[in-house]
């Protein structure tokens, strides 16, 4: 039973690491493209900023969903019931 709990914690940690890495890469690409497009067409900067914040919220949602799934696996582990 301890091996299942250990594997679940390691899996949840890997899930959180990949979600954080993906979110960081997404924010970096988003910020770079926003600055590039704002420099190219400054008159569209306010419209682009609104769209950038919407996409940033969606990117952040990916990490929050990963946190929720990890907490589910850590505290309400569905795999332990298979052992009993």
UniProtKB/Swiss-Prot annotation:
Localization (cell): Cell inner membrane
Principal localisation: membrane
GO cellular component, one term: plasma membrane
SUPFAM superfamilies reported in the protein's UniProt record: F1F0 ATP synthase subunit C
UniProt KW keywords: ATP synthesis, Cell inner membrane, Cell membrane, CF(0), Hydrogen ion transport, Ion transport, Lipid-binding, Membrane, Transmembrane, Transmembrane helix, Transport
Similarity comment text for this entry: Belongs to the ATPase C chain family.
Assembly mode: F-type ATPases have 2 components, F(1) - the catalytic core - and F(0) - the membrane proton channel. F(1) has five subunits: alpha(3), beta(3), gamma(1), delta(1), epsilon(1). F(0) has three main subunits: a(1), b(2) and c(10-14). The alpha and beta chains form an alternating ring which encloses part of the gamma chain. F(1) is attached to F(0) by a central stalk formed by the gamma and epsilon chains, while a peripheral stalk is formed by the delta and b chains.
Function: F(1)F(0) ATP synthase produces ATP from ADP in the presence of a proton or sodium gradient. F-type ATPases consist of two structural domains, F(1) containing the extramembraneous catalytic core and F(0) containing the membrane proton channel, linked together by a central stalk and a peripheral stalk. During catalysis, ATP synthesis in the catalytic domain of F(1) is coupled via a rotary mechanism of the central stalk subunits to proton translocation. Key component of the F(0) channel; it plays a direct role in translocation across the membrane. A homomeric c-ring of between 10-14 subunits forms the central stalk rotor element with the F(1) delta and epsilon subunits.
Protein name, entry field: ATP synthase subunit c
